[in-house]
Regions:
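Positively charged n-region of N-terminal signal peptides that target proteins for export
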Residues: 1-6
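Bacterial N-terminal signal peptides
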Residues: 7-16
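Pepsin/retropepsin-fold aspartyl endopeptidases
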Residues: 21-354
Length: 354
């Protein structure tokens, strides 16, 4: 009965977040600061964005998680949430569902899939608060997420991790989900917005300057680039179209894009992904993995969008990946350009140059 009632509440919460917004005077989007991080060491130029989780339930967390437009649902490392003695590589040491500081930790196991890695953990429920302490954003109800106890390389079975690995993922794709019956969905599906705004969000340019830093040292710069709530006057600056979920297995929407560099264009459904440090282009599974040389001029043509031209500045920045099913446009795009999702109209939009 408890699970049935929880499911009903979650369905109501998600549906309410996709209802039309109020027609009152238009409010302002909520700005969420993002942490810009370039990892130290080798390989160089691994660049990511993070959003800080302030609290889960009644528990203060203050844990940055990887911001990922290419997945849906939140995961967080066990030791960031629960007592260390509860966490191990073999599982979370509980024998029954437990309420801990407003977090319902269940015994239900789940696996979340990311590229070549899988995250194992338990389903939990809590109200999530994230962003800036000065202007925090909270989900309107407790939401499901994964407390992970290990991350595994899918091809080798090796448990991976360490100080410089993300302590979890903040997946904000508006489609799909993870865990049983895709129940673990984007926290953005449970966030309300100001009057007159469409539910959704947009990412403004994060800038081209990067700093080698770590979340552990707390020395990374921040940029207010995530905006929750879509105003009409902002949306009109984007070229928008209905989003596509090309394959039911994809936990992300795609656009039909072609990438070329003085050769035949490579056209595939394309993910615009903050969670990927490089740009990845499809090639035949029998070919080797390669990358473009520094100084290569690249053209990205997308149906219904302006052409995006750029020149590679390091290697690997554009990788040619055998067996990949879709193209991935990674963090380079977000330095000077914008991405928008309107949940109410189910539209995706790009804006070049600002």
């Amino acid at each position: 009965m408890k699970n049935f009632l929880t499911t009903l509440l979650l369905i109501f919460a998600v549906q309410s977040c996709f209802l039309p917004a109020s027609v009152d005077a238009e409010g302002l989007p909520t700005k969420v600061p993002l942490i810009k991080l370039e990892y130290p060491g080798k390989p160089k130029n691994i660049r990511m964005l993070y959003v800080k989780i302030l609290s889960l339930g009644n528990r203060t967390v203050n844990q940055p998680l990887l911001l990922d437009t290419g997945s849906s649902g939140m995961t967080i490392d066990c030791k960031s949430v629960l007592p260390a003695e509860t966490c191990s590589d073999t599982g979370i040491k509980i024998t029954q569902d437990q309420q801990i500081d407003g977090i319902m930790v269940t015994t239900e196991a789940a696996v979340m899939n990311y590229g070549t890695y899988d995250e194992y953990g338990n389903v939990a429920y809590a109200r999530v608060t994230f962003g800036s302490p000065d202007s925090p954003v909270s989900t309107i109800t407790s939401i499901p997420f994964l407390i992970r106890y290990k991350t595994v390389n899918r091809s080798t079975g090796e448990i991976v991790g360490g100080p410089l690995w993300p302590k979890g993922n903040f997946g904000i794709s508006p489609v799909g989900g993870g865990g049983p019956d895709q129940m673990i969905k984007s926290p953005m599906a449970y966030v309300s917005v100001g009057p007159g705004l469409h539910r959704g969000y947009y990412l403004s340019p994060i800038g081209t300057k990067w700093t080698v830093c770590t979340n552990e040292d707390g020395n990374c710069p921040q940029v207010e680039a995530l905006h929750i709530g879509v105003p009409k006057d902002v949306k009109k600056d984007f070229r928008v179209q209905r989003w596509k979920q090309t394959n039911w297995r994809y936990n992300f929407p795609t656009l039909d894009s072609c990438l070329s560099w003085g050769s035949e264009p490579i056209c595939r459904p394309t993910l615009y992904d903050t969670g990927n440090s490089t740009i990845m282009v499809v090639t035949d599974a029998s070919k080797p993995r390669t990358s473009l040389k520094t100084g290569t001029k690249v053209l990205v043509k997308t149906d219904g969008q302006e052409d995006w031209n750029f020149t590679t500045t390091y290697n690997p920045e554009v990788e040619i990946v055998p067996g990949l099913e879709h193209n991935i446009v990674g963090i380079r795009y977000f330095e000077k350009n914008s991405l928008l999702f309107d949940f109410e109209t189910r539209e995706i939009g790009l804006r070049l140059g600002h």
